[in-house]
Amino acid sequence: MTTIQLNARIEGISKPNFWNNIHFHPTDAVEDLWGHEILEKLRDGSARYIRLYTMFEDVVTRNEDGTLQFDFSEQDKRFDYMVAAGYKLLLCFNFMSVAMAKSPNELSGQRYKDKRFCRSNPADYHEWEQLCHAQAQHLIDRYGLETVSQWLFHCWNEPDLGFWIYPEFFFELPPEKQEYKITEYCKLYDYFETGIHRASPKLRVGGPSCGHYKVFVDKVLEHVTKGTNYVTGKVGTRIDFVSMHCYSSIPQDVNDPLRFKICPESIVNQYKVYRGLMEKHGLGELPAVIDEWAAAAEGYLGIKEYPRFQFRESEYYAAFYFKLIDLMAQLPIPPERMMICLSGQDHNSVDFDGHRTFFTARGWAKPIRSAFQLAAKLGETCLPLEGTDALPQNLGAFATRTENGDIQIALYNHVSDFGQSGDSLPVTVKIDNLPASFTVERYRIDELFSNPFTAWSRLGSPSTPTVWERELISRHARLEKPRPDELGSHKLTAETLLTPNSVEMIVIHSLAD
């Protein structure tokens, strides 16, 4: 039995919530009914910032005289909804309009709504600056500087991969094309920064949001700190945060048991490497934004292609998420934002198909969604626990306090090797110096609680469940409590048995005298 203790009156350390943020994909689902259904469910306060694309392919055309014409009407539908819903935004400025492209035929494959994006660099970088300025100014005019200055803006998505200039990944290119790809991105960033800050110096900009290749990030950070600015001719370019993508694994690793390496530590280690590059270039004090993270890349692939993607449907992902929060919070400088990537939503045609989503095709909340909702209950003051120096393998615990004095104790048992059995771990939590009167809530995510996937599986995985079967599944498609709320006075002793890949949170609410 592991015993964990907390003095409820102890001072804590401020740790702002960096974990409740989302990359919502595809962006143009924001205007659709199914997109609204998802976003409405997230209006419970669990999502702080949401990342979207500007989708310049919907914005830019040319007039008959060859000058650029900007039409933000399609974009306005999306951002109007997001602002009205109370979301703060991180906007990724991409992709290139065909009308502006140096290579207009450099198009992606078919995407949502039969659209394609253009990966080309601009034919004229002054036009790119003009577009970035017009975009920023339009947002300020429409929503006000007070609102927009709270947002984040970054330049392009994964320029080291097949989204920028060439369809090949960085490592697949010969040295001269690698150099060209980096040089052109640095130029793109300089003109992006100039255009946005011509609208207002109060807007925060960053990049490069690379998908994997650290040498690309290294060269970009070298440019913004020591290189010659392509616009001003001076040394350096303003950067307010460094953005990055951190995926624990790629599908090929997931599919091969010998290379299976999904674990929160993988994401943390990648973040540390990026932090090291920031420090190398004198940017160690800047915020870092992980604007995409997930346990595995390529959310548009599911169980059909990679059977082990079943973990996206199960309690495994919930425990993974809580361990990731715990590990990141222990770092000297955690990320300012960490955005879980939901980029399989438009491929979600049947329930529990392994795509990277919060909800199934019928709208049932997966365990990872319940975990995201549960994590939003955590406070922003971290409290030290006693008895956590030598915890059993896979067991983790951390405590927080909210501004109103409520206390949250998070416990998890995460078995990284998905599909392998682990031990159930008994835990006792003792808390002293509590108020004279308080209530205790306990939330649970495991194989049974808050787990519609298990309920569906036990019914035989029906493709067309009956009304009664849907009812049985729906009862677990929400954040569940394993026991009724309790009353307490001055101190609390709580016992639990953490089964493999389970999460439990004890929430203590002070009652007025």
Describe the role of every protein-language-model region.
Residues 1-152, 172-209, 213, 280, ...:
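Non-catalytic accessory regions flanking glycosidase/transglycosidase catalytic cores in CAZymes
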Residues 58-61, 98-110, 160-166, 249-254, ...:
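Short acidic/His/Gly/Ser-rich catalytic and metal-binding motifs that mark active-site loops
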Residues 159-170, 295-308, 358, 397-410:
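Short, charged low-complexity intrinsically disordered segments located at boundaries
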Residues 181-331:
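Noncatalytic carbohydrate-binding groove/subsite architecture in carbohydrate-active enzymes
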Residues 307-312, 355-363:
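Active-site rim elements
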